[in-house]
């Protein structure tokens, strides 16, 4: 029987089959450039969560920057690949198999409410079904400390189906505000690698959002 779409076993099969057109083999260029050059970029120390981390390229980058980073994914196969690429973990890098939408699983993994100073979003939001997006943003906001930040790179496209599912930047901004986040940066991303996975009409938006006290 085929795994249910969006579940851990379903993503496991995609990794095993090589159906990973989102994969760049490196951290997303807009995030890497922003963290390296923008004076508004968050600075260590801090505990950072990367939900839907996949092979963990952003996790490794953030650990190199000096953050303590938790790479979380529902796919055991993705985390196996992450360990192969970046090691089993260290005092600044931890891999966790859990669903960010499951608060009990997060708590069991040491991710209590308000336990993170930051969250870095890259390909998790576009991977989950749009019907779960408000729940996802609420879960992320609850994991942030008051005043904590969300740094996100979001795929915005109008093509049907997914994943990756598209979004409208204005609607997404409204949803982020509704979840309890205030914008500090919300703009088209520079150095975008969009167009992967055969999608030619796609814009990436970069945002830095702050949880309201």
Question: Residue ranges of each PLM-predicted region?
Answer:
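Short catalytic micro-motifs in class I SAM-dependent methyltransferases
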Residues: 123, 127
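Local beta-strand N-terminus motif with an aromatic residue
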Residues: 115-116
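Class I (Rossmann-like) S-adenosyl-L-methionine-dependent methyltransferase catalytic domain
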Residues: 1-49, 54-112, 128-143, 148-213
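A conserved beta-strand element that flanks and buttresses the S-adenosyl-L-methionine
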Residues: 120
């Amino acid at each position: 029987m085929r795994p249910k779409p969006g579940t851990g076993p379903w993503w496991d099969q995609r990794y095993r089959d090589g159906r990973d057109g989102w994969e760049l083999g490196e951290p997303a260029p807009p995030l890497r450039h922003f963290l390296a050059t923008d004076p508004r970029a968050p600075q260590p120390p801090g505990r950072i969560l990367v939900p839907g981390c996949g092979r963990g390229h952003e996790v490794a980058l953030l650990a190199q920057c000096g953050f303590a980073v938790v790479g979380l994914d529902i796919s055991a196969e993705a985390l196996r690949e992450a360990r192969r690429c970046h090691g089993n973990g260290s005092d600044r890098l931890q891999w966790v198999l859990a669903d960010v939408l499951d608060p009990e699983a997060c708590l069991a993994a040491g991710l209590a409410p308000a336990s993170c100073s930051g969250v870095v979003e890259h390909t998790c939001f576009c991977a989950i079904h749009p019907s779960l997006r408000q729940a996802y943003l609420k879960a992320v906001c609850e994991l942030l400390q008051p005043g904590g930040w969300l740094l996100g790179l979001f795929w915005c496209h109008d093509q049907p189906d997914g994943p990756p599912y598209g979004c409208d930047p204005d609607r997404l901004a409204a949803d982020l505000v509704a979840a309890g986040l205030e914008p500090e940066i919300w703009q088209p991303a520079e150095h975008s690698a969009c167009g992967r996975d055969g999608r030619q009409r796609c814009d990436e938006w970069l945002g830095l959002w702050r949880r309201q006290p």
